[in-house]
């Protein structure tokens, strides 16, 4: 376990920068869309571009990694993500932003697949849940930090977009300078969706439904909070709580999944998430009624924290569960397949 973590520090640091930029960007675009008076339909359309790209990228990434390797793919798509965010500040239009979000989605799914296949290659069935949970802690913790950067400058200025680009570019440094060798699969075996389903029907179906949930939460949370008249600081707090509570949950739930049937842990977490998501909606509607607004917001925060605690660790559990049933030379294809199904659920 310690050896795996020591050999993966560059990947963890690089992904930390990537996710910090992603968290900042997600909130920034949602709030900027409201300030530009995009309609709710236009905003939803624009933000959905990310998952269209996610869906497209997942279908092609195994072949790209097989041809040029993990490090080059990480570097290339990090550079693309860094470039794309700058164009948002120049061309403020829902359709243009949709196309840019498609490119961002392609970039991110390629980066995720590189990172997750790298970690799966380094870990074993005995510690895979714990390793992936630490990875997810870093991801969601970084997202939380990035979301607080929304207070850096007004979303109407160009400076926040430049900062997102700078942070994304910084992710290249540890990856390109590491002495640790990336995975060296002699051959990355293809894996059709049918093969993936045969290997892990539970993992594939779970990935689809997880995509439907997380796409709505991460793309529209800032928009929803803005519509409830939350201040920029309050929006930062809500999005930060989403990420940090999910980060805190990763390791204990991942550790539990290494000790017990991962499927039961996923099912239990799903029920918890459903209950507290419903409570969050009920409490948020109370804010529009006469009464103690501060109490309503506090209850909203608490129920939302527990929802995040239950829901955000699920993808690492799904990935670990699926990889328990396949050989190492199929990790890249299986990871990309799960990302593909996740993207399909996200745009459905």
Question: Which residues does each PLM region occupy?
Answer:
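Helix-loop boundary and gating motifs at the non-cytosolic
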Residues: 2-51, 200-207, 212-224, 228, ...
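Helix-to-loop junctions at the C-terminal end of transmembrane segments
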Residues: 57-70, 154, 249-261
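Structural signature of the two symmetry-related core transmembrane helices
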Residues: 72-86, 165, 264-279
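Cytoplasmic helix-loop-helix junction between adjacent transmembrane helices
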Residues: 102-137
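Intracellular juxtamembrane helix-capping segments at the cytosolic ends
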Residues: 110-123, 312-326
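C-terminal membrane-cytosol helix-exit motif in multi-pass small-molecule transporters
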Residues: 150-151, 165-185
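C-terminal transmembrane helical hairpin of 12-TM major facilitator-type secondary transporters
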Residues: 263-316
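A late C-terminal transmembrane helix in Major Facilitator Superfamily
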Residues: 329-348
